[in-house]
Amino acid sequence: MSETSFDVIIIGSGPGGYVTAIRASQLGFKTAIIEKEDLGGVCLNWGCIPTKALLRSAEVYHNMQHAADYGLSASPQFDLKAIVARSRKIAGQLSGGIKHLMKKNKVTVIAGFATLKAGQDAPIVIVDGTDYTAKHVILATGARARSIPQAGLEPDGKFIWTAREAMVPDTMPKKLLVIGSGAIGMEFASFYDAFGADVTVVEMVDRILPAEDAEISKMARKAFEKRGLTIKTETQASVKAGAQGVTATLTSKGKSETAEFDRVILAVGIVGNVEDMGLEALGVKIDRSHITVDEYSFTGVKGLYAIGDVTTPPWLAHKASHEGIICIEKIAGGNPHPLDANAIPGCTYCHPQVASVGYTEAQAKEAGYDIKVGRFPFIGNGKAIALGEPEGLIKTIFDTKSGELLGAHMIGAEVTELIQGYTVAQKLETTEHELMETVFPHPTLSEMMHEAVLDAYDRTIHF
């Protein structure tokens, strides 16, 4: 093959793209990956990883402020510039790690913006005037923040921010408006609140974290309001930037109020990066800025596939990675199981953390299941008390007939690390009896996972 001819070309190097490239190389494909910015995509450079670095700084600062609770003394101060610099350093370090992985796995990296035109086996990929050919082309172009210009909800890089601007603030805003209460919105609300900003969160529907179980959402709201956040649900926002800040009009149930804010963060969803690549001319089906694909990520256009945020929800990094592996293994002639969207865990890294997998209680009932529900509070767990984290809940949902674990929902310290236990249990179709008979180590937070199963069958021990 020539330097412009490959077995597989992947466009986009986020967690969908680079993972797929590595697996393609492992399967023996001559592979290239095309990236217009930094290796690692939005997730690694401007999303998942750097936000966790910021939130870690917020967590440490919060703990220092409460040092007396642990028999310690501290007079903490924060250096915003240093906090941001640490986050950026980590992103840069990991992007460099992806570069190393590409070299190690003999993946050719091509820098630039890719467009497509019709080809023989698959679309021809054009970068900076050079044609690249492959038998299979995989789109992993990701997504960007959604804007609503008619309501003034359009980033200006100064007063009205997307997540990217919110990650690199020059100063800490005194008053901050966060529009949207999904994972992105609540993580930034948690970060800025920790460092003293007066944060207001606006959500159109009747509860924050609307994708989560209603009971967990209610507990999250209570915890955030206890920390001092103002939360307005069933509220729409329109904003107008001025010389020194933003005037927001907040409307709920026909009544409007105006308020002034230093900054606004838009967290009202995402749109797929599908523009200016020539997809429409190829006949790619696009629904509301996201590409329609089948269970193996095939677009319907010969040799063309799409994975990750540019396709259908849930829009999660780990879903993109897994989709990519399924896609390339299918291309290689394997018979991988299609991805079960209901078995993908979701995590929100605010304080308190929120995590879930499977059906919510309402969804399970709507699906026609007769269910048993178990609950166990953090206050009943010795490790949680020792950590100084007594607020939280683990909730389980079982099918009464089969004993199948239908869903699990958590709020509290480190639940984003606990949820995978239930995810594995779901994948292995573990029954309630098998979970109840499993030995959990003591003292750990994971014991609550056991107790939440026991509670569904009236056998809980410690509460």
Language-model region placement:
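Short hydrophobic core segments
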Residues: 9-11, 114, 132-142, 179, ...
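Gly/Ala-rich phosphate-binding loop of Rossmann-like dinucleotide-binding domains
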Residues: 21, 25, 189, 193-194
